[in-house]
Regions:
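Predominantly soluble domains enriched in secretory-pathway, periplasmic, or organellar proteins
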Residues: 1-219
Length: 219
C-alpha cells in the first residue's frame, strides 16, 4: 500500500507487518497516487504554499516501484490533485489551477514516453473516477450555478454526454466514485452531513442516502 504524506514524501506500507518499510521524497504536498507500468505517479499540489511567494507546485513525480526512487518529475498545469490510471498505459491528472486566471485542466500522461497533453474534449474538471475504460467527471468550480457532468472513453479517446440520464440535479457535488458498474456522487455544503447519490449503469438514480460531513469515497 502506498501513502502520500503532506510533508513531501510517499511511504510504502507492508500489508503483512503493517509497518512502513520505505519512504521516497517527491514534490510539495503530494495528493493522490496512481500505479501504471510498474511506476507510481504522484500529483504534487503545493497547496499549503498557495498564499506564499513559492505558490502552488505544478509537477507529477514518477517513482520506480522496483527501486522505490523518484526517477522523473513531469511539468503539468498548476496545482495537480486528482490522478487516475487506465489500462492503456495512460494516467489522467486534474490540475485545479489558481482559481482565477489559470483554470481547472484535465491532462493525459503517456506512462512510457512521459508526454503530457491537455484534453481538448473536456478541458475542465474538478473530480473524476475511473472504471472499465471510462472516466466519470464533474466540473463544479466555486460559484458555478450549474455543475457539469461528463464521461470520457479512454479507449476511443472520445468524450460522451453526462452519465446522469434521468435529470437528477446535484447542486454541490463534492466527490465521485465508480464501483461495480455504478457511479456514486457525494454532495456537500461543508457544514452539514452530505448526501450520496447512487446511479446505475443506465444513468438513473436508484438510491440517495445521508452520509457524514464531506463524504470523500465509496468502495
Amino acid at each position: 500500500v502506498y501513502i502520500s504524506y503532506y510533508n513531501g514524501c510517499v511511504a510504502r506500507l507492508d500489508t503483512a507487518s503493517l509497518e512502513v518499510e520505505a519512504k521516497v521524497k517527491v514534490g510539495r504536498n503530494p495528493e493522490q497516487l496512481a500505479v501504471s507500468s510498474n511506476k507510481l505517479f504522484v500529483s504534487n499540489s503545493g497547496g499549503m504554499d498557495y498564499s506564499t511567494e513559492v505558490g502552488y507546485d505544478k509537477t507529477v513525480s514518477v517513482v520506480d516501484l522496483s527501486t522505490f526512487t523518484e526517477i522523473k518529475k513531469l511539468d503539468v498545469v498548476l496545482n495537480p490533485t486528482r490522478i487516475q490510471a487506465d489500462e492503456q498505459g495512460n494516467v489522467y491528472v486534474v490540475s485545479m489551477g489558481n482559481y482565477a486566471d489559470i483554470p481547472n485542466t484535465v491532462q493525459k500522461i503517456n506512462t512510457e514516453t512521459y508526454e503530457v497533453t491537455s484534453l481538448t474534449h473536456w478541458p475542465n474538471a474538478t473530480e473524476m473516477a475511473y472504471e472499465d475504460g471510462k472516466l466519470f467527471l464533474f466540473y463544479a468550480q466555486w460559484g458555478m450555478s450549474h455543475p457539469a457532468f461528463l464521461t470520457f472513453d479512454t479507449k476511443s479517446q472520445s468524450a460522451g454526454t453526462s452519465f446522469i440520464t434521468d435529470g437528477t440535479s446535484i447542486q454541490s457535488p463534492y466527490s465521485i466514485s465508480a464501483v461495480g458498474g455504478n457511479v456514486y456522487v457525494a454532495e456537500s455544503d461543508y457544514k452539514n452531513n452530505g448526501d450520496i447519490y447512487c446511479f446505475g449503469g443506465d444513468g438513473k438514480l436508484f438510491k440517495k442516502f445521508e452520509a457524514g460531513l464531506n463524504p470523500m469515497k465509496v468502495v
